[in-house]
């Protein structure tokens, strides 16, 4: 009962201009500039985000996730040494990063009408992949570092 109501709550008001502003950094520069020029929405644009904090928090989150997965699967998957663990998590993390780029960002996000602002309905305006590719490229070293840290943690575990 809790999960369906949580899903309904998070889905509520999706596709509205205010809700779309939460993902403001994902929009192409052309869209961001149009939002800044919009009298109503420019006041609601989220404050800038410190990218160093975002990268560090992503590394911490994925190191914890990889560490938990590794601790659970250490003997099942046969992680016998650092390199086994590191390669597994490196492949897993980079595959996740690539999936996010191709499926979520390039195939879904740019083509769904839910992410469009009411005053910019043209699909063509949302097609510039630069922000998504930049995010993917930032993810490569982040996932590599998370894999490295998780592999180190697994080496310490009995």
Model-derived features with residue positions:
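Juxtamembrane/disordered regions of integral membrane proteins
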Residues: 1-158
């Amino acid at each position: 009962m809790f999960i369906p109501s949580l899903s309904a709550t998070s889905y509520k008001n999706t596709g509205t201009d205010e809700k779309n502003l939460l993902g403001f950094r994902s929009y192409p520069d052309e869209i961001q500039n149009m939002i800044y020029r919009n009298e109503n929405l420019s006041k609601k644009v989220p404050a800038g985000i410190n990218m160093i904090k975002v990268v560090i928090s992503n590394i911490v989150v994925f190191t914890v996730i990889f560490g938990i997965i590794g601790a659970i699967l250490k003997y099942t998957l046969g992680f016998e040494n650092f390199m086994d663990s590191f390669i597994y998590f490196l492949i897993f993390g980079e595959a996740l990063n690539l999936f996010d780029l191709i499926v979520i960002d390039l195939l879904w996000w740019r083509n769904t009408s839910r992410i469009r602002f009411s005053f910019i309905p043209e699909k063509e305006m949302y097609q510039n992949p630069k922000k998504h590719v930049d995010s993917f490229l930032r993810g490569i070293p982040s996932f590599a570092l998370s894999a490295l840290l998780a592999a180190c943690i697994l080496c310490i575990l009995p």
